Amino acid sequence: MNIEKLRVSGLEAAIRGMRNPYDSWEKSDSYFGLDSFDGIDNYWIPKMLNIYLGDKGVPGLTEENCSAWIRSNGIIYEDCDLCEFAFIGPNDMDLAQRLISGGSEHRKFLRQINVSFDLTLPFYVWKEFDTYKVGTTANSCSTMHTLKNNPITLDCFELGDFENIPFPKEYQRPDAKSNCDEDFIQMCLIPYLESLRLRYKETGDKKYWKELVRWLPEGWLQKRTITLNYEVIYNFCHQRKNHRLAEWHTIVNFIREHLPYASEFIFLDELKAEVEEVEEDSFLSELFVVLSKLGELKDGLYEYTHKDKKNKRK
């Protein structure tokens, strides 16, 4: 499988539109536009750094990682020396995350953030991906043209976690003239499919094409250009992140690592859990310091020394 040519658009309209119900456009602190790499590094990142470090900002964000976070999320496309940027400020981030936490009826702005990429998957994953029809458009490569013009080899199939399981002799027909138990896929299946392709190409007889399509395995790779939005991505990432198919894990991890503000918008629940864990650890550390000043630790418990202060009369 493969994911390439990622593009993200619509962030400016989405952030602007999410403030419409509140008539609060003056509170927006995000910036969008085009600039050079020098402009990004020398003007925009310092500007956003000052905004975030002087405000509440994103939970868990520190001075050490703030600059890297702003750059990695804010640059949404690079073209030679120019960058398209979308730097979302803390006010807009706070509102966006509250809307996301409020549910699908409140996070409508996610539907206005558009994403497109080329995705190559085997048929057995496309069948599940096609579940997400609403808000998704796809143009696929023609299976007919691909089969006709290109030789069928092992590389035409998904091999990411391929295990060449032998074809046991006890399951083969007793009158079989050849032994395919060592490598059934390469010795029998793929040569048979390639022979059907060649005979169809030579004769034009559709019976060969029909049999080729009939017996083509589900692991056959097909490329599609996909257009969808953050809401669709939000749904399938939460529904498929623990799926038994490894390909879904690859897709979810790609989204997590490459989409702008994926942690803050799509995986917000995980981000909150991490922040709560850090805050809990910090609280326990501070509590330990306080308790250690009050008493001595004995057998896993703190023993306190109580000193009565008696009022002395003169």
List each model region and its residues:
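Family-specific signature for flavin-dependent thymidylate synthase
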Residues: M1-K314
